[in-house]
């Protein structure tokens, strides 16, 4: 068992002071960066950083978190086996984003006492003090437990993140707060036997309410069609969409080569 590291409330609060969020450009803008691509460590926990090849220290970049599934690790986000690298988002970003893949504790995101939220807070603080980030353009996505952690971020960090994309998620990393609006995309297989489809719908419905959207039923594809149906909720203060696809509990909906989740996620992020 990996020893539990308790992050103090001071750490979490120091990462997000009101003065930080009054500005758009991070304090790392204009600096010669010291953080390089590869593995970095904060208080015994690791994350992988990917900075664009054409990184410009004076240009504010999107910041995108890719969160792994249960039994996985940060390397699964970048190795291109179960999913396209970085959930297919790096190629679509075309050098406009900095990517982070944190490593979950004990191969997951139990988020005991908010420790995983505090870890992500600390990563943001470290990255943004060294690199040029648009602080109004932070995003998170993940599959399964990584989706649950993305949902947890939507609950407790809606004012710090612009949007999340939750792939086959559930309420498995907690939902501290959970009353603020945030742009929310859910993607879920209708035959998911691990985290049921209706649970994914319920996650989205929370932000339908938070964002003041008009209530609407979620469309579903015909079983066996290998298709998908997207529902865009109307009247929202921040967008909420849900994609139901003909599949199960899949890290890459409709297959690793499918553009469904990568295209939908990146376009949703950029339109949020």
From Swiss-Prot:
Cellular component terms per the entry's GO annotation: extracellular region
Domain of life: Eukaryota
Signal peptide: 1-22
Catalysed reaction, written as an equation: feruloyl-polysaccharide + H2O = ferulate + polysaccharide
UniProt subcellular location: Secreted
Molecular functions (GO terms): feruloyl esterase activity
Protein's recorded name: Probable feruloyl esterase C
Lineage: Eukaryota, Fungi, Dikarya, Ascomycota, Pezizomycotina
Gene name of this polypeptide: faeC
